[in-house]
Amino acid sequence: MKLTVDPEADALYLTLKGGKVSRTEELADSLIVDLDETGALLGIEVLWLSYRVAPEALANLNIELPLGKK
């Protein structure tokens, strides 16, 4: 899992797993999900991030968490 903030795009992207994006669905005005060909969730994008989170909280917010297999 990887969390990335793009200040220029004013967006946050949470990568849940690797794979090829087959389709993208907008769940709300500022919430978009990427799905693979089977409909599995690959990532979540939150737009207009600066309206939701204080800019100083986002200054260096890039987190990568390896997911282990169970």
Predicted regions and their residues:
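Alpha-crystallin/small heat shock protein
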Residues: 2-5, 59
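Amphipathic, hydrophobic secondary-structure cores in small proteins
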Residues: 12-49
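Short linear motifs in intrinsically disordered/low-complexity regions
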Residues: 7, 35-37, 61-63
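Short, positively charged
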Residues: 4-20, 68-70
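C-terminal structural segments of small proteins and small subunits
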Residues: 43-70
